[in-house]
Each structure stands twice: as structure tokens, then as C-alpha cells.
Amino acid sequence: MQLNPSEISELIKSRISGLGAEAEVRNTGTVISVTDGICRVHGLSGVMQGEMLEFPGNTFGLALNLERDSVGAVVLGEYEHISEGDTVKCTGRILEVPVGKELLGRVVNTLGQPIDGKGPINAKETDVIEKVAPGVIARQSVSQPVQTGLKSIDAMVPIGRGQRELIIGDRQTGKTAVAVDAIINQKGKGVFCVYVAVGQKASTIANVVRKLEEHGAMEYTVVVAAAASDSAAMQYLAPYAGCTMGEYFRDRGEDALIVYDDLTKQAWAYRQVSLLLRRPPGREAYPGDVFYLHSRLLERAARVNADYVEKFTNGAVKGKTGSLTALPVIETQAGDVSAFVPTNVISITDGQIFLETDLFNAGIRPAINAGISVSRVGGAAQTKVVKNLSGGIRTDLAQYRELAAFAQFASDLDDATRKQLERGRRVTELLKQPQYQPLQVWQLAASLFAANNGFLDNVEVKDILPFEKGLHDHLKTKYADLINRIEETKQLSKEDEAALRAAVEDFKKSAAF
């Protein structure tokens, strides 16, 4: 068969015109090494800091170190199936997690995937986990309270909506108990809660979830769990994922409360990731940016003004402020609050609740040291009735602690000193509270009123808590109108004060105290 040149050229042209040359441009690289969840990848010349990378087997990673000819990335999840020579692709996306009310009542991992066996979560929206905190102009001052239901906190270390209040103490001092009680007390108050568990035993997390379910608190709570068995990368990112879920409510004019339990373990996880990425270590082998690790997280907790909410929702929500209140937890070693991470977080937050082992072992629970626990902005948010009644309590306690130290050495004490010591003992006893039994505002007001006006002075110390319970029951059965007025107005008028005095006197006469 003879082909002339013109036929050959026509054949070639027709083949070229029919050729599908649509190429997909992908930035790819090759795995050089994989150790302890850290992958070194050659190539990926166009990768961004913090970009999600796609590994074989539908596994994702995060680009953290951008070097001249390689990229250091952490793998999110299992990494055993990744081997040298595997192809890695850029996704062009930043790490996102699902957000919205569909998450309420669920337990999820750092990536927002359900781990409670209750089926998939059909969240309609996702959001990035790393965000810039609201600016100064978008914020509003803290002026509404977050009632924890714990007498010693609501009276002496009040927390406001949009505040960051640190809970700090050694292991086994009741830090998680305080945080869980605060979540349980938000029932019916329109506050959505997020509990972030970092580096804890899976059994401990399951126990907290069970308690929240028992008290009906899971209806308005999301639990983000990064257990001790999860990779360091998942533990380090969990608080940011939880914060994004909380911000969903804040930015839409709702109130949210987030507990980070605890940030010490997050700092340990970040230190591990940084050292494996061969970043230079600093004090206590932490990387240089460990302060920024916590500051950029905690600055996202804020009270935002109505303009911000209106702009964010494109006018759908008008005239409502939103807030995200943070309760970060820090575990100290042998009471050393001057270590690197505790001092960092103390300087970032708006106050701290300091829990002491000695008080805990002495049976004073919650074991709050009233002397060094402070709330720098919560005073403006405290309910009027509690604010007016709690001033005397703090003074009584401070004087009692001071005198108790001297009283150990002095054999004979004058009447005034003895009186102060007796009152201090009773106030200390009054501030004890069993776990999972948060109090309402009227109950706290009644207890503080009884202490301030000397009604407890002739009650035996061992009878203080039974006296308090009896008083609350007495008020509930016979003085319902008074209770409702205190709950509604959050104030104690002259008439109500006289009625409350009469009620307490009436109870003391009828009861055998």
C-alpha cells in the first residue's frame, strides 16, 4: 500500500485534533521518610503553611515545616500504611471541621468525625480551625454572668460571658469536676457548651460523657475527644477544632461556654510534634512559639457586639451580642505555678481559680484557695444580689485564714478574735458543696444572707450543711413568691430583705438548730 505525503499529514492532523489533552495540574510530592506520625515529603513546591495534604488510603496530613527542598507534615490519624515513595498531593484547602447545632449531643474526634457509635452527623456547614480572633472594635465589655452553680466561684470568683477564667491545680484536685459542674448548671440558660478532652484516658472521657448524659447536659453540649491513645497531632489540634465549633454560636448572637481539659497536655503534644519536626527547643524543651499556641486559642473567646453579629449574619440576626466563654484547665506539678506553661496561661487569661491539694485532702471541696484566686473582669458581670451579699464572705475568709495561722500558737484569745475564728470556720463549711449539685441564684443568696447576718454563729459546724439544705427546702415550700422575685430581678429589695430575714428566723425557730 502506497501512501502519499499529503495523506500522511491529513492522518496526523486528524489524530492530533481528536487527542484529549486536558491535563489536571496537581502539585505532588514523594514521601522520603515517615516516623512517629511525621512525614518528610520531597517536592510540593507550591504548598502553603497549614495546608491539608492527601496521602494514599484517604489519609490527610498538615504541612507545618516548609523547607528548601522538602516539607515536614504531620499525619492526621493512622500512618502505618504510608511508606517511602508514596505520592502526596496538595489539596489547596485549610483544615476544616463540621459546625452547627447538628453536633449537639455528640462525641467527635479532632476532625469532627463521630466516635460515639450513633451514626453520621449531617452537618450543613464546615469552618476552618485556625481563625483570627475578633478585633478590638468588634468586642463588647463583659457584663452578663455565667452561673457555675458553685457557691465559692459565684460568690468570690465570678465569671462573665466572654471571659477566659483559668482553672489551675495539681492532679486530683477536682479541676474537671468544677468544669463539668459549670456545664451541668447551664441547663435551661440558653448557653451551648463544648467540652474538649485532650490527652486523657478514654475511660475518663467516657465517664464525663456519662455524667453529662445523666444530668441532661448533652442536649446542649458537644464533646471533642483526643484521647491519650490518639496521635500527638490530633491532641494538639483538638482545642482549635472545639473553639471553631463554639465560635459558630458566638458569631450568630448566641452564648457558648468551652472547656479545654487540659492545655498542659496540649502543650506536651505540641512539644512532641515540634521536636519531631526538628524545630529548635527553648525553655523546658518547648518550642519558641508555645505562648502563641495558647494566646491565639484563648483570644478567640470573647463577647462580640451586635454590629459584628449583624455583619457576620448579613443582617439575619439584629440587636444580639454573642459570646464564647473559655475555661482552660492547667495541671501543675507539685503546686508549681511558676513553671513555663502555667505562667503563660495565667498572663493570657482574665483570672484564675486555684485549687489546692491540702484543701482537697482536708475535705474542703471544691478546694478553691480564695486568697490567690481572682477574676479580673467577672465583678462587672456578677448578679446584683450575690455581689451585695458576697463582699462580707471574702473578708471573713481572708481574716480567718490569717488568724487561724496565729491561733495555732496562741493559747488565750480575746473574744473578738475567737468570734472571727468561729465565723470563719462556719463560712468555710458553708462553701463546701457536693459534686453535680449546682445551686440556683436564690439558693446562693439565701446561704450568703444567713452567713452575713450571723444566723450561722450559733449553729454547730457539723450542722452547717444540713441547716443550709433545710433552709432551702423551707423557702421552697413556704416562700415561693420571694424565691421567684429574687430569680426574676436578681436583686434583694428592702422588702425582700425583710421577708428573707423573717423566713430565716422562722426556720431557725421551727428547726432544731
Swiss-Prot record:
Cellular component, GO annotation: plasma membrane; proton-transporting ATP synthase complex
Keyword Translocase annotated: yes
Site (Required for activity): S373
Keywords from the UniProt entry: ATP synthesis, ATP-binding, Cell inner membrane, Cell membrane, CF(1), Hydrogen ion transport, Ion transport, Membrane, Nucleotide-binding, Translocase, Transport
Membrane disposition: Peripheral membrane protein
Domain of life of the native organism: Bacteria
Binding site for ATP: G169, D170, R171, Q172, T173, G174, K175, T176
GO molecular function terms noted in the UniProt entry: ADP binding; ATP binding; proton-transporting ATP synthase activity, rotational mechanism
Subcellular localization, as worded in the UniProt entry: Cell inner membrane
EC number(s) per entry: 7.1.2.2
Location, primary (coarse class): membrane
Keyword presence, Cell membrane: yes
Reaction(s) catalysed (UniProt annotation): ATP + H2O + 4 H(+)(in) = ADP + phosphate + 5 H(+)(out)
Similarity comment: Belongs to the ATPase alpha/beta chains family.
UniProt subunit comment: F-type ATPases have 2 components, CF(1) - the catalytic core - and CF(0) - the membrane proton channel. CF(1) has five subunits: alpha(3), beta(3), gamma(1), delta(1), epsilon(1). CF(0) has three main subunits: a(1), b(2) and c(9-12). The alpha and beta chains form an alternating ring which encloses part of the gamma chain. CF(1) is attached to CF(0) by a central stalk formed by the gamma and epsilon chains, while a peripheral stalk is formed by the delta and b chains.
Function statement: Produces ATP from ADP in the presence of a proton gradient across the membrane. The alpha chain is a regulatory subunit.
HAMAP family recorded: ATP_synth_alpha_bact
Name of the protein this chain belongs to: ATP synthase subunit alpha
Organism lineage: Bacteria, Pseudomonadati, Pseudomonadota, Betaproteobacteria, Burkholderiales
